[in-house]
Amino acid sequence: MAVRLLRVASAALGDTAVRWQPLVGPRAGNRGPGGSIWLGLGGRAAAARTLSLSARAWSSSEDKITVHFINRDGKTLTTQGKVGDSLLDVVIENNLDIDGFGACEGTLACSTCHLIFEDHIFEKLEAITDEENDMLDLAYGLTDRSRLGCQICLTKAMDNMTVRVPEAVADARESIDLGKNSSKLE
């Protein structure tokens, strides 16, 4: 079994803080799709986004844009994010109080970061992937302008945009109830 250490940046400790995280399992450190690192977890493998400290970690306020989130309760949460960061990163890094948002931490395994975009912004977004589309099919309140926040990275053209959080959240990871189909072993 392989064991490697992964150097990761910790947003909670500040932009320049670094810590080491052990990777264990037969596939530890193997590269997966898109250059992600596969983490061995109890015999199962899970993809994790690789984090690196780059020039954008020390970006100036000129590289930040303003984003307005209309929360489920109708209140507007205004914050700033770095160009290149995903909307999920913006919510996490700014500790925005959006209940249940980003439960899978951006691994395309839930749909809790479902957002609804303004027409003029939606038209400029990169094409949706099949994987994102599959997750969106499970989202609550799906519209023709829906996307997952973990898949949308900020650009300068998005400055001052408003995105709406749907009224309810559906976590695709909880859509299958195995308890009802399980038989009791005696």
UniProtKB/Swiss-Prot annotation:
- Where is it predominantly found? mitochondrion
The record's subcellular location field reads: Mitochondrion matrix
The protein's name in its UniProt record = Adrenodoxin, mitochondrial
The cofactor remark states: Binds 1 [2Fe-2S] cluster.
Specify the superkingdom. Eukaryota
Q: For [2Fe-2S] cluster, which residues are the binding ones?
A: 104, 110, 113, 150
Q: Which organism is it from?
A: Sus scrofa
Sorted alphabetically, which CDD domains does this protein's record hold?
fer2
Gene (UniProt): FDX1
**Protein keywords:** 2Fe-2S, Acetylation, Cholesterol metabolism, Electron transport, Iron, Iron-sulfur, Lipid metabolism, Metal-binding, Mitochondrion, Phosphoprotein, Steroid metabolism, Steroidogenesis, Sterol metabolism, Transit peptide, Transport
Instruction: Supply one GO molecular-function term.
Output: electron transfer activity
- Give all residue intervals belonging to the 2Fe-2S ferredoxin-type domain: 65-169
Per the UniProt entry, what is one GO biological process? hormone biosynthetic process
Outline where the chain's transit peptide begins and ends: 1-58
